[in-house]
C-alpha cells in the first residue's frame, strides 16, 4: 500500500502466500526463489561453511523489470560467492539481484556488489580473536533466524560452544517456539550449550 505506483514489487516466490500475488498497481511482481524457478532463481548452491556460500543466480529475461534504466545485460546468469556464512544468505543475494536489476545494473555489477557484502555487529557477524571464533547473531532473533545461526555454527570446525538467549515478541506460542528451536538444536553436534533467560532454560 505504501509503494510508489511507478515502483517495483520484489517478492519471495518460495513463500506460499506471496506467490499468489499476480499484480500490484497493474504490474507483475518480480519473484525470486530456489524451489520456484519462475523469475530470478538460484541453483548449484555450495555451502562453504564459515567462508560463505557459492551459487548460480539466473536472471530470467521474461521476469526482467521494465524501467528507464533497464540494460540489455540484466538477464544474464552468473556464479557468485556470497562472503557471509549460511545457505539462507542465498535468498538475500537473490533479493539484492532483483533490486539491482530494477535499478538497471549489469549482471557483473550485481555480482561485484554481492561479493563485496560485509556484515555488521550482531547480524551473522564473525569475530576472530586470540584463537577463538565468535558467531555474533544475537540481534532480535526469531525461530527461523535462530535455526539458521545454529546451522552456521554446526559447519564450524573445532569445539563448539552455543550460547542462546530468549526470543521476544513471539506471542502466545512463545514457549512452543522455544521448544522447537531446542529440539532442532538437539540434532546438531554442539560440545557445550548455555541458555540465558526464562524461556530458554
What are the roles of these predicted feature ranges?
Residues 1-134, 158, 183-186, 190-192, ...:
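Acidic, Mg2+-coordinating active-site environments of NTP-dependent enzymes
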Residues 120-122, 138, 142-201:
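Active-site beta-alpha connecting loops in nucleotide-dependent enzymes
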Amino acid at each position: 500500500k505504501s509503494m510508489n505506483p511507478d515502483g517495483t514489487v520484489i517478492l519471495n516466490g518460495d513463500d506460499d502466500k506471496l506467490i499468489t500475488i499476480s499484480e500490484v498497481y497493474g504490474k507483475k511482481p518480480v519473484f525470486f526463489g530456489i524451489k520456484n524457478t519462475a523469475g530470478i532463481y538460484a541453483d548449484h548452491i555450495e555451502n562453504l561453511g564459515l567462508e560463505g556460500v557459492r551459487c548460480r543466480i539466473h536472471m530470467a529475461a521474461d521476469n526482467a523489470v521494465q524501467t528507464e534504466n533497464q540494460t540489455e545485460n540484466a538477464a544474464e546468469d552468473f556464479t557468485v560467492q556470497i562472503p557471509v556464512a549460511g545457505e539462507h544468505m542465498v535468498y538475500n543475494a537473490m533479493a539484492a539481484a532483483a533490486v539491482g536489476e530494477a535499478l538497471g545494473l549489469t549482471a557483473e555489477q550485481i555480482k561485484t556488489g554481492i561479493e563485496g557484502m560485509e556484515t555488521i555487529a550482531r547480524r551473522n557477524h564473525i569475530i576472530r580473536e586470540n584463537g577463538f571464533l565468535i558467531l555474533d547473531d544475537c540481534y532480535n532473533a526469531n525461530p527461523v533466524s535462530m535455526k539458521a545461526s545454529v546451522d552456521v555454527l554446526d559447519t564450524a570446525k573445532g569445539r563448539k560452544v552455543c550460547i542462546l538467549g530468549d526470543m521476544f515478541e513471539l506471542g502466545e506460542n512463545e514457549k512452543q517456539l522455544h521448544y522447537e528451536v531446542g529440539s532442532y538444536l538437539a540434532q546438531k553436534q554442539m560440545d557445550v550449550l548455555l541458555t540465558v533467560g526464562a524461556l530458554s532454560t
